[in-house]
Amino acid sequence: MGHTAHNKTKLLNRVKRIRGQVEGLERGLDEGRDCGEVLQLIAAVRGAVNGLMAEVIEEHLREHVASPDLASDERARGADDIAGILRTYLK
């Protein structure tokens, strides 16, 4: 079982909180809130997404790169996977 399946409930709860924050941002824009409030809402969404990403990355590194049970080619593949994902995420 993969680490995302193992932590499914915890990760889904984070996603639901992010959804709520995005809905709050949408309401703020729809209601014409001032730019400072909108920026604060955007920062909250960004922080929540970054937190989710960090949690999944950490577990990926533990399971697919740092696990002592992995062969060196499996570790290299895990490191390559995460490097590509980080490149895409940080664009």
Q: Which role does the model predict for each range below?
A:
Residues M1-K91:
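Solvent-exposed interaction patches of small proteins and small membrane subunits
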